[in-house]
Structure formats: structure tokens, C-alpha cells
Amino acid sequence: MKISCLPVSLFDDICSGRMSLQAWAETAKEIGYDGIDLSMLMLTAHTETYLQRIRRELDRAGLPVVMATTYPDFTHPDPKQRQREADYLARDIALCDQLGIRYLRVLAGQAHQEVSEEAGVTLAAEHLRQADAVAGKYTVQLLYENHAKPGAWSKVDFSYPIDIFFRIFDQLKDTGILLNFDIGNIVAQNREPLPILERVIDRVETVHISDMSAYGKFDPVEIGTGVCPIQDILKRLKGYGFQGWLCIEEASGHGLAGIASAWRYVHNLVNEL
């Protein structure tokens, strides 16, 4: 199992330009990571010259970009906005293909009060299926996540409640969409991750390793200092034969120190399996 990192603690630095993507990749390589993850928020254009420059810089750093994260809002009550979201996602898929990014994490949408659970499930599943058809034109694998709330949104994820997540997940089983399984988001709902993992393990392609301060509370902390049963999850994955990427979602707010300690913790756990 290889290890990459989505550097949530560095989002402000990277999105503002204080830290370049090349510098992030070079730093991750020095720490020991096998790859890096990016947010679409970090990419400021989709012109060919810009993307060629970004790819050259990342290639010089010598680490693959494993996963990009994006934030489609397919449960928006306005049909015109939902179409915009679909078009934005199609662009993101093409952009990932051009940058050589293997995985693109996708979401259901936000929990809009005007949209019922039944309507939201239908809308999310329909649009994700359409996005899968777009991804099929490229070398990009879409990954759906049991997600909570990104900074890019004002509301929590519509499918944050695990029962809603399962309803959408079940409607995607005949598509090419696989899963990015997030440990911390389940703990934040005061649920145990292992039983949830058992339900979806045959569709898990990557794992977001995150940690929370307590069950029932969305409060990210340094990886290995919280209550998430990370070691138990890794043992079960190994027993299943999982050989995919462990994508650390480092959101403790401790910057590079937190990102380095997260790698040491997960690296040691993997070596002990």
C-alpha cells in the first residue's frame, strides 16, 4: 500500500500562490510520500500552456499526482445550476486526463433544505452516472466518497448521513465509479468504520486516512492522535488483499509538521502489518 497526501492544512498557502504545486510535491517527496493529491481549487486555469507548465513542474518534482478532489453540487435545487455543475465536472475530468491524474474524487452535492431525500438521491445518482460516461472517454477513474463538508461549500454533504450514502452507492454499482473510503467522516457521525467498510470493501479503490478528536464530532486532528481506528482498518484492508493508495487527508491545521507526522504514523502502521 502506497501513501499520498491531500494537504488540507496547506490549502491557503497553495491556493494563494505562497506555495507552488511543485514545491508541495518536492516537500512531500522529501518527507517520504509516494504521491500527492490536489484539490481543483489549486489549479487556476485550464489553458493548454498553463497545464503543460504545471505538468512539467510536477514531473520535475518526481512524484505522481494520485488523486484530485472536486466538488460537484448535483443536488442543487436549480436545474440550470445542476447543468453548470455537470459541465464543470466534465472540464475537471478532461483536466485530470491532461495532467495524468489517475483518480478524481466526486461528491453528491450539498444538503439543500428545498430538496427532499428522495429527490436528492435520484439527482445525485443520475448526474454521477452521466459523469462516469464522460470519464470513460479519458483515463480518469471517478471515486465517490462518504463525505462531510469541504471549505468550498456552505452546507454539509447531502450524502453525509451514511444511510443516504448507501442509497446512492447502491445505484452506482453497475457503473465504473468506485469508492474513496474516508475513515474520519464515519467516526464524526458517531459510527464505527469497520462495519461500514465491510459493506463496501469490494468497491474501495482508495482510502482517505483522517482522524477526529472524538466520536460524533467533526474535528480533524493530527493523524494518530485521535480516536479513529486507523490500524484496525488497515489490518482489514490487508486481509482483504487491498493494494491501493492510502491517501492521507491532513486537516489538523499544523501545516508541514502535521503532514510529516501523518506520514510517519501511517508508514509505521503499514510496515507493521
Model segments located where?
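A generic structural signal for short coil/turn motifs at secondary-structure boundaries
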Residues: D12-S16, P77, V115, A152-K155, ...
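Short amphipathic alpha-helical segments at helix-loop
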Residues: D73, P77, H112-S116, F218, ...
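Active-site-proximal loop/turn and secondary-structure-junction residues that shape catalytic pockets
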Residues: S9-F11, M40-M42, Y71-F74, A108-H112, ...
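N-terminal pre-domain/capping segments
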Residues: M1-R102, A125, G136, D170, ...
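Conserved beta-strand positions in the central sheet of alpha/beta enzyme cores
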Residues: D37, M67-T69, R105, L143, ...
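A generic structural signal for short
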Residues: D12-D13, M42-L43, K80-Q81, A119-G120, ...
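Histidine-acidic metal/acid-base catalytic patches
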Residues: M1-G32, S159-L273
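Active-site acidic/histidine proton-transfer and metal-coordination neighborhood
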Residues: E26, E57-R60, P79-L178, A188-Q189, ...
